[in-house]
Amino acid sequence: MRPLAIIGPTGTGKSALALDVAERLGGEIGVEIVNADAMQLYRGMDIGTAKLPAAQRRGVPHHQLDVLDVTETASVARYQSEAARDIETIAARGAVPIIVGGSMMYVQALLDDWAFPATDPAVRARWEQRLVEVGVATLHGELGKVDPDAAASILPTDGRRIVRALEVVELTGQPFAASAPTIGAPRWDTAIIGLDWETSVLDERLAARTDSMFAEGLVAEVAGLLRHGLREGVTASRALGYAQVLADLDAGGDGSAAREPTFVGTRRYVRRQRSWFRRDHRVCWLDGGSPDNVDRTLRAWRAVS
């Protein structure tokens, strides 16, 4: 059974659309969802990632949620392998896999079977030492000078991925994205739906989403995760919302001042997501406010199938 992917910027309603599609198909065939949001891989990172609670998943099985502790480092290559196995297993039992998420490299690695360049421990160690010496913001700026596209797609707080991109550039002499596949037929002939809103409307949605996260207890969630090693987590500690709350707590605040930088950071991330996904000509884009998105999604999927 061929998969369906629902991708796009943060806060556009991808999870809700996926569940609506799953319910519509449920009378005909089984449906299971495969997460493609890097931060939803983490156990306990629920409020700040807008992870759907189990009770709100409408009985639809979900995969690649809550598979890492916050002390573990998320890896695109590992995700690619494990999520691909999930998709092929779901399809083999005659159900439809729906891939849902907006983590750019995770989506592309999965749908295009991205082959990752080899690593060199000595080169990696040298860039990691450089990160310690100059800090993540400066190193992100250095990446921007040698590979602007990679810098645009990587959060300026994500030291691990900045180091990896610089390592690949040094080892291959090519931009980090040169290791990415040429966009052609998507893996498994996946139908790809993109969900987005007009910018001012999405900004309002992001503001409301940010307010809701703080009202629902994001600061308390971060405090609880600190007891489980969040601060030592290479990737988890840099997640949007979590990094900002940590910074405010470290500055002696109570976490509430993290609301505005979280909103600003999320809006900036949305711009990067749009730039990345809009380059993919295979995506069928839908307006998030349209009332017939389920029907349009199913038409696109059936046209592929």
From Swiss-Prot:
Keyword Transferase: yes
Top-level class of the enzyme under EC nomenclature: transferase
Catalysis performed (reactions): adenosine(37) in tRNA + dimethylallyl diphosphate = N(6)-dimethylallyladenosine(37) in tRNA + diphosphate
Positions marked as site (Interaction with substrate tRNA): S103, R124
Binding annotation for substrate: T10, G11, T12, G13, K14, S15
Highest taxon listed in the record's lineage: Bacteria
Single GO MF descriptor: ATP binding
GO biological process per UniProt: tRNA modification
Cofactor(s) this protein requires: Mg(2+)
Residues reported to bind ATP: G8, P9, T10, G11, T12, G13, K14, S15
The entry's keywords: ATP-binding, Magnesium, Nucleotide-binding, Transferase, tRNA processing
UniProt EC number: 2.5.1.75
InterPro entries assigned to the protein according to its UniProt record, in alphabetical order: Dimethylallyltransferase, IPT, P-loop_NTPase
KW ATP-binding (keyword) present: yes
Function: Catalyzes the transfer of a dimethylallyl group onto the adenine at position 37 in tRNAs that read codons beginning with uridine, leading to the formation of N6-(dimethylallyl)adenosine (i(6)A).
Subunit structure: Monomer.
Cited PANTHER family: TRNA DIMETHYLALLYLTRANSFERASE
Family: Belongs to the IPP transferase family.
Family matches, as NCBIfam families: miaA
Protein name: tRNA dimethylallyltransferase
